Amino acid sequence: MKREEIADLMAFVVVAEERSFTRAAARLSMAQSALSQIVRRIEERLGLRLLTRTTRSVVPTEAGEHLLSVLGPMLHDIDSAMASLSDLQNRPSGTIRITTVEHAAKTILLPAMRTFLKSHPEIDIQLTIDYGLTDVVSERFDAGVRLGGEMDKDMIAIRIGPDIPMAIVGSPDYFSRRSVPTSVSQLIDHQAINLYLPTSGTANRWRLIRGGREVRVRMEGQLLLNTIDLIIDAAIDGHGLAYLPYDQVERAIKEKKLIRVLDKFTPDLPGYHLYYPHRRHAGSAFSLFIDRLKYKGAV
């Protein structure tokens, strides 16, 4: 087989995996028109249609899926081989792209970076704050950080933090207008300041203990915010009850700006995990970052 034919087949694999000529062209750094001609040339050579094209997507035909299943692993083996060669460099380098929730960034990732980045000056880290359940593969992240149990089962998940004590809090001003709840059922009479979840377009449900078992409660409220700091400010201003990690409101509680309630009904949340796809080649920079983050305390 000629070298050009091999290159054409590799280009087809990228189009079939991306399900898009636009994304494939960007990944291969070539024009969409040239990529379309390559695929058409392969189809003419084989006498088979490999892709079904629509205005919004590209879907492999049965023949295309078969070809992808054979060639895809070969391409990834080549990528892994090239990546392993780059790892032979004396100093790990590159950019590690992580999608994470705000609390994990503040309490785990940023503290870990204080020494990590000083020790590895040629490694860059990009953090993107996002409360959605991000697909790290399609969004081009190296890994994501979410609570244990939230990531897909086909991901490798590594625990990077302890369980998280939660707190329900309200301001003295709020409780001057509303009774202090003493049971989960009484929360129906209260306003909540909720965390916005972009994946579902709804508010975060509160994990509480009711009747001896954990339940997820949807709270009603007029405010839907997307950062912890804004929720804390709104709670201090008396807009309602907030459900937050205890370490983020501990100071405000000690300063009597907030009052904690229902602490016996708020179970700890499972600790944060770093997750990434099984097929991802763990380069030296990424491996070092994983080793730095691994939780070494008692689970």
Curated annotation (Swiss-Prot):
Q: Which GO terms describe its molecular function?
A: DNA binding; DNA-binding transcription factor activity; sequence-specific DNA binding
Q: What family does the Swiss-Prot or TrEMBL record give for this protein? A: Belongs to the LysR transcriptional regulatory family.
Establish whether keyword Transcription is in the entry: yes
InterPro entries in the record: LysR_subst-bd, Tscrpt_reg_HTH_LysR, WH-like_DNA-bd_sf, WH_DNA-bd_sf
Residues the UniProt record assigns to the DNA-binding region sit at: 21-40
**Keyword Transcription annotated:** yes
Q: Which organism is it from?
A: Escherichia coli (strain K12)
BP GO annotations: bacterial-type flagellum-dependent swarming motility; DNA-templated transcription; negative regulation of DNA-templated transcription
Keywords noted in UniProt: DNA-binding, Repressor, Transcription, Transcription regulation
What is the designated name of this protein? HTH-type transcriptional regulator PgrR
Q: Which cysteines are joined by disulfide bonds?
A: none
- Role according to the record: Regulates the expression of genes involved in peptidoglycan (PG) degradation. Could play a role in switch control between recycling and degradation of PG peptides. Negatively regulates the expression of the ycjY-ymjD-ymjC-mpaA operon by binding to the PgrR-box. In addition, other genes are predicted to be under the control of PgrR, including genes related to membrane formation and function.
* Pfam families the UniProt entry points to: HTH_1 (PF00126), LysR_substrate (PF03466)
Q: Which residues form the HTH lysR-type domain?
A: 4-61
